[in-house]
């Protein structure tokens, strides 16, 4: 069985109002006591699997959950153990009659099934109500309680929206109404994940990295884009959740920025692949991503320029700007507007464009040709001292660096590495040029002491060096790309 649900965290100031909205007279309240099992080295958790026994009212239920194709869908197998005073010993024989569940366990545990043991427990009061919305039945469940190990405890206060019948689109639309009213923020971390972190005395799971995406020749252009967006959301949301929960490490911020940049470039460069792409998405994602880029540039300057700044006030102001940028980012990732963006992109990734009949290889080739043409036109009007045009050239290179491995995955071309290397050289020069340019702009806007003016001169000189490298590497790439007719 596939479970379709979304989970949100509730700001403390909105919790009472949300509980009232459920209307206790129309809601059911049940106690949920659960025991979660795993091996000492967390084989289930590492595979995105959770195994629990839970007292639901008067009955014990054994549940196996596994990650689905998106953060909105999960595999779930429930087995009613009956009305018992206490939970039975963990029984894995029940999965002999459930091939998919058995395969999930086998893949995760191998020959370590006997090593499963209790890792943590939860004690939750759940207030739930089924609400009909636009022909769709949605179960709203407010969970209040705690996750506990022998050494630690973490409060739970969250709301889940589960699709009981109807469309996923209506589930997401309904969820957003509650997001707006109660300032909810999307959290893809499960209770099992939080419990495992408590049990291993960690604050946060490792950052989720990007996965390589390859086009499937069997897909339409529209389906390919939906699959690409879905994969990018799988990359984005766990890292955004860590930032929203204020437990993120630098790698979570870096990975979230990369995911946002990839989403922005996907809806910008491939927008004619699918009629469901909104014109506003690229602008929204670009603006959001620029906040991450701003923080990244400030941190880069602190690590590379701080030692050169003679005036302590300049260095102090840079540190203050970094703290402010981090605080602003922490608020932005869980803002109502951005949570709405996440939900819109989730809706998009889960549906195909029924109007689209475009052949994937044809449109992929056309997209690549358009980018080459734009790059050629840009370099034709770019000179070494024209920083504005150099900025645009760097942008064209960054766009092509993103799209090239995706678009060329559908070609039967040997030695693509040669073209990739030429493009990579251009991209490295573009990235360094952009970093230097941003640093120079920041320094120019700062009230520098005379002793610090040499830093601006040094940046300008380095900027010109990498501008020349960018021009030369771009010319070399354009010469090398003869496989595209």
Go through the PLM ranges and name each one:
Residues 1-485:
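Function-determining surface determinants
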């Amino acid at each position: 069985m596939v479970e379709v649900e979304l989970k949100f965290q509730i700001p403390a100031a909105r919790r009472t109002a949300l509980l009232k909205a459920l209307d206790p007279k129309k809601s059911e309240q049940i106690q949920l006591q659960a025991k979660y099992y795993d091996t000492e080295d967390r084989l289930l958790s590492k595979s995105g699997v959770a195994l629990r026994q839970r007292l639901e009212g008067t009955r014990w239920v054994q549940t196996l959950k596994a990650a689905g194709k998106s953060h909105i869908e999960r595999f779930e197998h429930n087995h009613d153990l009956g009305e018992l005073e206490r939970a039975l010993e963990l029984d894995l024989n029940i999965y002999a009659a459930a091939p998919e569940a058995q395969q999930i366990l086998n893949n995760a545990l191998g020959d370590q099934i006997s090593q499963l043991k209790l890792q943590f427990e939860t004690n939750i009061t759940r207030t739930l109500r089924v609400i009909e919305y636009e022909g769709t039945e949605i179960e709203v469940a407010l969970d209040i309680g705690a996750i506990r190990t022998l050494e630690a405890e973490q409060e739970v206060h969250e709301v889940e929206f589960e699709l009981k019948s109807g469309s996923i689109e209506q589930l997401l639309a309904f969820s957003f109404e509650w997001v707006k009213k109660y300032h909810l923020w999307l959290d893809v971390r499960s209770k099992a994940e939080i419990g495992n972190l408590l049990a291993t005395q960690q604050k946060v799971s490792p950052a989720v990295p990007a996965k390589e995406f390859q086009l499937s020749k069997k897909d339409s252009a529209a389906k390919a884009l939906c699959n690409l967006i879905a994969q990018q959301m799988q990359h984005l949301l766990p890292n955004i959740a860590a930032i929203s929960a204020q437990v993120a490490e630098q790698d979570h911020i870096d990975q979230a920025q990369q995911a946002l940049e990839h989403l922005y470039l996907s809806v910008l460069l491939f927008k004619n692949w699918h009629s469901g792409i909104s014109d506003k998405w690229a602008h929204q994602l670009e603006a959001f991503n620029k906040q991450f880029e701003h923080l990244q540039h400030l941190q880069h300057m602190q690590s590379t320029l701080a030692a050169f700044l003679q005036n302590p006030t300049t260095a102090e102001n840079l540190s203050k700007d970094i703290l402010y940028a981090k605080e602003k980012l922490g608020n932005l990732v869980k803002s109502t507007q951005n949570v709405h963006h996440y939900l819109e992109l989730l809706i998009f990734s889960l549906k195909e464009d029924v109007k689209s009949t475009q052949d994937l290889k044809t449109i992929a080739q056309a997209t690549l040709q358009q980018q080459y043409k734009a790059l050629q036109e840009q370099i034709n009007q770019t000179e070494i001292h024209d920083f504005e045009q150099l900025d645009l050239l760097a942008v064209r290179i960054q766009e092509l660096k993103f799209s090239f491995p995706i678009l060329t995955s559908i070609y039967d071309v040997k030695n693509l590495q040669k073209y990739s290397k030429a493009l990579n050289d251009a991209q490295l020069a573009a990235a360094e040029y952009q970093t230097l340019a941003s640093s120079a702009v920041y320094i120019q806007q700062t009230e520098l002491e005379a002793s610090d003016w040499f830093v601006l001169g040094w940046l300008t000189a380095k900027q010109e060096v990498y501008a020349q490298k960018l021009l030369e590497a771009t010319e070399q790439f354009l010469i090398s790309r003869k496989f595209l007719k």
